[in-house]
Every structure is written in C-alpha cells, then in structure tokens.
C-alpha cells in the first residue's frame, strides 16, 4: 500500500478507535498501519495491550512480527503465545481460523510447511480468490525452503 493510502487508513482507524475505544479490531488495524508507517513504538504499545487483553492471537502475531523485524528477542515470547492459541483455535474451529493461522505460520511463525497444510485446509473450506492466493503463497514459501535445503547439500 502506498504512503498516501496508509495515511488515510491511519486517519480512519484512529477515528474508529476514538469513537469506540474498546473495539480491539480498530486498535489492531491502527497498530498495523502505524508499523507500516514506521511508527513502531506506538504500534508496539498498542499491540502489547491488545495481546495481553484479547484471546485473539492476531495481536500477539502482529506484535511478534514487528519485534522480530526490529531485531528484538522478545518476539519469541509473543510468537509462542500466538502459536499455541492458533493451534487451539484451529483444533476446535478450523473453518474459522485456518486462514489466519496459515498467515501466522507464513510470517512470524516461520513454518511454511504448517502454513501449507492450513492453506490447503482453508481452500477446502472456502474456495475464494483470497484462499487460493494464500495457498499459492504457502506453496511458494515451501519452494523457497526446499531450494535452500537443496543448495545446502551441494
């Protein structure tokens, strides 16, 4: 997304946050946009609050990704929390969480094989363009891992 669109998104999510401060998705999306705009400290503060107060693992996942990108070892803690919660949610409600869990394992969770399994499950549940795009990204991530393994054995 270009900077102008990110600025507009930040304004919109901040307005939503001010109107309904307890609405976690507005806070989470605002943090995501802030991180993209380089407002890392604000994004981290917002996500830390959400990650400890919400049972939605997306916030811990976003927090882990931003901390990892910043080179902070705390990312492991948040990544572990998100991983455990996604595993629980996929076990009990696969149709609702397979896509989000696959996104996590492609990103902060760094397990493309698990992402591929979940992306395949997601395509079986919902045959949408978004589901197929997620599957394609998971396949590509596994091909990259496979190529690295092959190269290391040369």
Which residues make up each language-model segment?
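Residue-level recognition of tetratricopeptide repeat
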Residues: 32, 65, 103-104, 137
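Alpha-helical adaptor scaffolds
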Residues: 80-113, 120
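Structural marker of alpha-solenoid helical repeat scaffolds
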Residues: 19, 52-53, 85, 89, ...
């Amino acid at each position: 997304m270009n900077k102008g669109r990110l600025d507009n998104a930040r304004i919109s999510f901040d307005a939503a946050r001010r109107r309904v401060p307890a609405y976690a998705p507005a806070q989470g999306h605002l943090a995501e946009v802030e991180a993209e705009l380089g407002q890392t400290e604000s994004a981290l503060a917002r996500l830390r609050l959400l990650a400890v107060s919400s049972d939605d693992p997306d916030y811990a996942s976003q927090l882990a990704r931003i901390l990892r990108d910043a080179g902070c070892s705390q990312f492991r803690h948040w990544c572990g929390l998100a991983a455990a919660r996604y595993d629980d949610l996929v076990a009990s409600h696969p149709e609702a969480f397979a896509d989000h869990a696959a996104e996590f394992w492609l990103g902060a969770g760094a397990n493309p094989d698990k992402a591929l399994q979940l992306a395949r499950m997601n395509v079986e549940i919902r045959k949408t363009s978004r589901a197929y795009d997620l599957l394609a990204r998971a396949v590509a991530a596994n091909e990259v891992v496979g190529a690295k393994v092959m190269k290391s054995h040369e």
